Amino acid sequence: MKKLAAVMLTSCLMVAVGASFADEMKKDDMKKDVMMKKDDMAKDEMKKDSMAKDGMKKDAMKKDAMMKKDGMTKDEMKK
């Protein structure tokens, strides 16, 4: 009878330890998911910032092209 009680006790403890370990792993996975989401959000913000810079580049290119055209018309007027 003592052996049966000892086996039951050890098996219950093994199940409890396994469940505890599984919970810890689940919490760890949740932490990793949260960190990955934060990292993705940071990357999205970087993309938005680079898109704004692209807009500035395009605007500068337009101004540069307009100034070149203006310079050409002034040269034509001189002739």
UniProtKB/Swiss-Prot annotation:
Keywords: Oxidation, Periplasm, Signal, Stress response. Induction: Part of the SigF regulon, induced by chlorite under positive control of SigF. Part of the probable yedZ1-yedY1-mrpX operon. Transcript levels are 20- to 60-fold increased when induced by chlorite or hypochlorite or in the absence of anti-sigma factor NrsF. Not induced by hydrogen peroxide. Coiled coil: none annotated. The keyword Transcription does not apply. GO terms for cellular component: periplasmic space. Its main location: periplasm. Residues 37-79 are annotated as: Disordered. Disruption phenotype: Growth somewhat inhibited by chlorite. InterPro entries: Penta_MxKDx. It is found in: Periplasm. It comes from the Bacteria. Transmembrane segments: none annotated. Residues 1-22 form the signal peptide. Serves as an oxidative stress sink, specifically for chlorite and hypochlorite. This is Methionine-rich peptide X.
